[in-house]
Amino acid sequence: MKMRAIVLALGTTLLLSGCQNMDSNGLMTSGAEAFQAYSLSDAQVKALSDQACKDMDGKATLAPASSTYTQRLNKIASALGDNINGQPVNYKVYMAKDVNAFAMANGCIRVYSGLMDMMTDNEVEAVIGHEMGHVALGHVKKGMQVALGTNAIRAAAASAGGIVGSLSQSQLGDVGEKLVNSQFSQRQESEADDYSYDLLRKRGINPSGLATSFEKLAKLEAGRQSSMFDDHPASEERAQHIRDRMAADGIK
């Protein structure tokens, strides 16, 4: 998935809490350094993920515990396990038509009802496995490091002024645009696909759902309907890669 929504939520939280004394000229000229690597510890990534997840949950419509969506996701979650590299995970459903899902470094896993409406349990398992892969393989951490590479966001993160302030809409838009354009590379997407395949095999789950989920997404792409895989390698190629792995492993 794209880091867009996650990083935008994170950046906005940082900006609104600590930029009151930032020089606007410096902010507008920071574009040349927009994608410099910014060093973050695992603890910092987790803390920032906590903020971003809380912000997104606050803006979303969450499915209640009694919802059939939540009950279904809980069943799926029990099959996938309760941690990513030792980090405990928690699952929630966003009631929205988007075909999307994401995972954060703090174990925050969110699935949109639109994706659940479109896919079988096996396919949802595969998609979640893919998102877990982005966390386990360090892609999420790298994405945050890139997004936090701007002088503007770096200053916001380091600010200790303590006085709540805000930037103008144009300034927020300038920084937000840099954050919104952050996304995983095709190589990272392919690595996450293989992670999901291996995870499903390890958990005794048939990986065919990974291939069929891509085939469904290929139909969305043909109809030009936006989905979580807009920036990923072609879905047909990804489906074939999974079927090739299944054939090599003797799985029908």
Q: Over which residues does each language-model region extend?
A:
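A glycine-rich, hydrophobic loop/mini-helix early in the fold
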Residues: 10
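A Zn2+-metalloprotease active-site environment signal
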Residues: 2-7, 17-252
